Amino acid sequence: MPGYTEYVLAEGSFSYGQAVAVITAYRNVFIQDDPGMHFRRVIRNAEGQRRWRCRNSEADAGKQLNAWLASGGLLRQ
């Protein structure tokens, strides 16, 4: 879709709203185990296999996610 660009998070923990912004921009990023405030962000490869996941509340969650998005994120077109 036109207008989608790379989305980069701050290096620390991230909010649900920030998570939604990322899953809107990338087609292989998902939210998992969503009981409310604490959830996991998951990146899958083209075959659907999990490549990475972390909890949104981890101290370096954004830093880890940014690195995985740079190497394996599939932007929506």
Swiss-Prot record:
A Pfam short name: DUF905
InterPro entries tied to this protein: DUF905 (IPR009253), YkfF-like_sf (IPR038612)
Residues of the signal peptide: none
Domain of life: Bacteria
Membership in a protein family: Belongs to the UPF0401 family.
Record-given protein name: UPF0401 protein c3666
